Amino acid sequence: MYCVEDRFRQGLTEEEREGLTATEAREANKQRLRSPHLLLLAETDEGLQNLYRLNYYAATQGFYGKPRIDLKLLAKYSKGLIATTTCVISNMARYFQNKEIDKMTGFFNDIAGIFGPDNLFIEMHPHDLDMQLEYNQVLIEMFRKEYEGFKCILANDVHYVRKEHNDTHNF
């Protein structure tokens, strides 16, 4: 992420500069490959600096196949960030798939303790996959009962909109 803002915004008009800087933060855990992740978005300038810090530490201290962070580091640099629970490769979804609902809610409680209801969103996807549909239903039921203050977002796991955005995405 080094200098991403400067390089990405170079030559853009003021209107074209609108947007949020975000990253899929992979979690350092025992499961070394295809580690679960959270989506982190910089809401403020301080959040942007924290996003840079997290990416720096992920690349220099947590790298194992991919840059990774742990929840302790995330808690230290969470101010100004918004998080979402992401897709079916998230910790919560994996716990659900393994029928470990206690671990699923435990993980959510951990990240809820870091971000709170104003900066953590439960992410659901409209994909017509049995696994996704079941996971969405569990999220709806669980969060209606236990986590009323948290909001849901509907996402599509789209990393870029147009083919020509690929260069910026892979930047």
Listing of model-derived features with the role each one plays in the protein:
Residues M1-F171:
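Phosphodiester-processing cores and adjacent nucleic acid-binding clamps
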